[in-house]
């Protein structure tokens, strides 16, 4: 009896993704892809070129090397932002009917997990800018000496002589 219960639970788990059955996910395929067509489709090819990851047709999840490139790519970051905001269902979308040989891909999880994956592999999902550099170098005076201050540019230290007038020739 216990083993039959386990088999039934395994079967239910195999066809359910976060409360949705495989049939519900398959039925939602066209609508889910439709949510991405307008804004995401123009970014797919540039992201693929930047990263080497094939989202259309999907061959699986990106490798760590592809993730590093995706995290560094503005095209990929923009694409994943569109995916995150699309309101997709948490389903594996089976592209096999459209692209034979492709594998199911959970585009929702790819989008939602992108920032965390970038952080975990050190790719960061947002570009960082270097802090502004100072135009005036600062150095500490050597130990045991009294620091001196240079005069402002264009001035001379000490007493400034008064202007002289030329003396007449003899």
Curated annotation (Swiss-Prot):
Entry-linked InterPro entries: Elicitin, Elicitin_sf
Protein name: Elicitin-like protein 1
Species this chain originates from: Pythium oligandrum
Family of the protein in this entry: Belongs to the elicitin family.
Residues making up the signal peptide according to the UniProt record: 1-19
Disordered, as annotated region: 122-170
Compositional bias of kind Low complexity: 126-162
Any GO BP annotation: symbiont-mediated perturbation of host programmed cell death
Subcellular location: Secreted
Disulfide bonds: 25-91, 47-76, 71-118
Gene Ontology CC: one annotated term: extracellular region
Task performed by this protein: Induces local and distal defense responses (incompatible hypersensitive reaction) in plants from the solanaceae and cruciferae families. Elicits leaf necrosis and causes the accumulation of pathogenesis-related proteins. Might interact with the lipidic molecules of the plasma membrane.
Keywords: Disulfide bond, Hypersensitive response elicitation, Secreted, Signal
């Amino acid at each position: 009896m216990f083993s039959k219960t386990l088999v039934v639970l395994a079967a239910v788990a195999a066809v359910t993704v976060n409360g949705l059955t495989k049939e519900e996910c398959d039925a939602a395929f066209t609508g889910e892809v439709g949510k991405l067509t307008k804004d995401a489709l123009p970014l797919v090819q540039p992201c693929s070129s930047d990263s080497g990851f094939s989202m259309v047709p999907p061959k699986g999840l990106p490798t760590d090397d592809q993730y590093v490139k995706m995290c560094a790519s503005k095209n990929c970051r923009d694409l994943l932002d569109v995916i995150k905001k699309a309101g997709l269902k948490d389903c594996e979308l089976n592209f096999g009917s459209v692209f034979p040989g492709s594998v199911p891909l959970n585009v929702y999880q790819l989008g939602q997990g992108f920032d965390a994956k970038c952080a975990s592999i050190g790719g960061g999902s947002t570009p960082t800018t270097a802090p502004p550099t100072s135009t005036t170098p600062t150095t500490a005076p050597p130990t045991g000496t009294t620091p001196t201050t240079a005069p402002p540019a264009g001035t001379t230290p000490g007493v400034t002589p008064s202007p002289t007038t030329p003396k007449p020739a003899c």
